[in-house]
Amino acid sequence: MLQTTANLKALLLKKSVRTGTFTLASGKQSDLYIDCRVTAMDPFGAAMIGDLGWHAVRSKIHSEKLSIQAIGGMTLGADPISLAIGMASARQNPDEALQVFTVRKEPKGHGAGKQIEGNFAPGQNVIVVDDVITTGGSTLKAIDAIEREGGHVKFAIVLVDREEGGRQAIEARGIHVIPLFTRGTLLD
């Protein structure tokens, strides 16, 4: 896993990390922009995210003896990460395969008016996913939507924690956050 971590870090630095002046989704100004979608939608990046993510998720599930049925988060950032981890779970441990879902920013205005799409059912224990957390706002919105629909969020996994308070905001809700990288580990 160490080589996979190093390779994923190199790909994130090459494809996803930009310096300059940026306005983040949280509205905050930053000198660093991390667009994980570019790496997560690269086939090699997705494979590494899937393997590392599944390793981290499976370790947590087994150490705490959790029963988890599905994984997902707020579209669009969480989608390729959730799918990569779900695919890795099915490939590596078929008996523990995680179903995948996505959370819309708002409920659909037509049809069934659903906010959660894919393989999700009320009463399930799930993992919430995000690509990058800054304030934790997007992740908390996804958690709120999942809980409104009857899901039970057991923990969160994030590709990069910018270390700007988001992890603490999510954990204040009693939901542990597993970052694959932090700003510090990514940039060191």
Regions found by a protein language model. Name each.
Residues 1-63:
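Active-site-facing substrate-recognition patch
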Residues 2-11, 144-188:
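PRPP-dependent phosphoribosyltransferase catalytic core
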Residues 53-68, 143, 147-149:
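Phosphate/pyrophosphate-binding loops at sites that engage ATP/ADP/AMP, CoA/4′-phosphopantetheine
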Residues 61, 89, 93, 150:
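Active-site catalytic pocket residues across diverse enzymes, especially alpha/beta-hydrolases
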Residues 64-77, 157:
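Short glycine-rich phosphate-binding loop at a beta-alpha junction
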Residues 82-127, 137-140:
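Short, glycine/charge-rich flexible loops or terminal/linker lids adjacent to PRPP-binding catalytic cores
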Residues 132-143, 166:
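Acidic, divalent-metal-coordinating active-site segment for phosphoryl/phosphodiester hydrolysis
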